[in-house]
């Protein structure tokens, strides 16, 4: 069974220590609920990932663990076969002892767009909401973050993260918790909170913004990336049914509308730092994610539209600061 004891130990003397009043019970219940299904099989695979301390680690320009020279060809093939059990790999890429995990998303491209605009992460306590397999968490660590906590309710994403961490070394202060943000108490403790690719999946986007705000210390920074459409502060797309074949997309605001939502949620210093149309090179099917991808979600005769006729995915990154005092948004 995946253990969270090292996380409890790391936060016991940190700004997150009051979380220990509730977190062990929540995660204990999660473990009891997931004794069956795919998780036990994945945990057996994790227990086979015994490799030497990597001779090189790079989290600053990539997520590279090991040069590939420490393993024989046979050992590298075995590692690749074990990691393949966790398909589909959606966020990456990773290079692990010479095994190149070419994920569906070029998440490094997103990081390169965002990183120049955020406050330096050195010595900061960071929360990544909807962290997926944890690619960006490793890049946050590479920027010098003191603690990085990622939350995502997916057991598969947790096991993908655990696979990478066990090979990299468990001593790194980066942790995955299989939780949704609605399961977090208002911690008021993180220096930086990231929410990337989550807001449009929330039925109540304002509630999500308030949940993000409540995790930040006063003066802390929110980095919000989400799907947007063109328009003024009153423009919001509500898909009638599906958007890009996804049935869990609820609200796509314009940048101006999104900034207004943030202001109403008691954020200040709100600024849009990037708007980018998702390209077919950034999101595509690969050997490590062989299912449908962006090209299958777009109109084959007009890639500026989804198959449903909506504007094709365009993503904006907004940075904002938690205001003082923390008043409840009505």
From Swiss-Prot:
The protein's Enzyme Commission number: 2.5.1.-
Q: Which GO terms describe its biological process?
A: tRNA wobble uridine modification
Q: Which CDD domains match?
A: AdoMet_MTases
Q: Which residues form the signal peptide?
A: none
* Keywords (A to Z) from UniProt: Transferase, tRNA processing
Q: Which GO terms describe its molecular function?
A: methyltransferase activity; transferase activity, transferring alkyl or aryl (other than methyl) groups
**Which reactions is this enzyme annotated as catalysing?**
carboxy-S-adenosyl-L-methionine + 5-hydroxyuridine(34) in tRNA = 5-carboxymethoxyuridine(34) in tRNA + S-adenosyl-L-homocysteine + H(+)
Which InterPro entries does this chain map to?
Answer: CmoB, Mo5U34_MeTrfas-like, SAM-dependent_MTases_sf
Residues the record lists as binding carboxy-S-adenosyl-L-methionine: 91, 105, 110, 130, 152-154, 181-182, 196, 200, 315
Assembly mode: Homotetramer.
User: What role is this protein assigned?
Assistant: Catalyzes carboxymethyl transfer from carboxy-S-adenosyl-L-methionine (Cx-SAM) to 5-hydroxyuridine (ho5U) to form 5-carboxymethoxyuridine (cmo5U) at position 34 in tRNAs.
Q: Belongs to which family?
A: Belongs to the class I-like SAM-binding methyltransferase superfamily. CmoB family.
Protein name (Swiss-Prot/TrEMBL): tRNA U34 carboxymethyltransferase
- State the species of origin: Shewanella piezotolerans (strain WP3 / JCM 13877)
- Source lineage: Bacteria, Pseudomonadati, Pseudomonadota, Gammaproteobacteria, Alteromonadales
Name of the gene this protein is made from = cmoB
């Amino acid at each position: 069974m995946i253990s969270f004891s090292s996380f409890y130990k790391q936060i016991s003397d940190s700004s997150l220590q009051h979380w220990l009043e509730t977190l062990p019970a929540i995660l204990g219940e999660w473990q009891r609920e997931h004794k069956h299904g795919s998780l036990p099989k994945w945990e057996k695979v994790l227990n086979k990932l015994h490799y030497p301390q990597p001779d090189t680690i790079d989290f600053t320009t990539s997520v590279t663990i090991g040069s590939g020279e420490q393993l024989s060809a046979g050992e590298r093939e075995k590692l690749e076969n074990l990691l393949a059990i966790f398909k589909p790999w959606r966020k990456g890429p990773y290079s692990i002892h010479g095994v190149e995990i070419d994920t569906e998303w070029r998440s490094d491209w997103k990081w390169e767009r965002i990183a120049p605009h955020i406050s330096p992460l050195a010595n900061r306590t960071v929360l990544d909401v909807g962290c997926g397999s944890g690619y960006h968490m490793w890049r946050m660590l590479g920027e010098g973050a003191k603690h990085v906590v990622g939350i995502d309710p997916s057991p598969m994403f947790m096991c993908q993260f655990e696979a990478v961490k066990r090979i990299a070394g468990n001593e790194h202060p980066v942790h995955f918790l299989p939780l949704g943000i609605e399961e977090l108490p208002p911690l008021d403790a993180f220096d930086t909170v990231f929410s990337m690719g989550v807001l449009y999946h929330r039925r109540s986007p304002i509630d999500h913004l308030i949940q993000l705000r409540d995790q930040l210390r006063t003066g802390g920074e929110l980095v919000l990336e989400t799907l947007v459409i063109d328009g003024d502060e009153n423009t919001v797309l509500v898909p009638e049914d599906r958007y890009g074949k996804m049935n869990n997309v609820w609200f796509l605001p314009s940048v101006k509308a999104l900034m207004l939502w943030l202001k109403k949620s008691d954020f200040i210093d709100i600024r849009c730092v990037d708007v980018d149309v998702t390209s077919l090179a950034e999101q595509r099917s690969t050997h490590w994610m062989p299912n449908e991808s962006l090209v299958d979600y777009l109109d084959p005769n007009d890639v500026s539209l989804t198959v449903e006729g909506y504007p094709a995915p365009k993503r904006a990154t907004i940075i904002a600061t938690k205001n003082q005092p923390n008043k409840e948004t009505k």
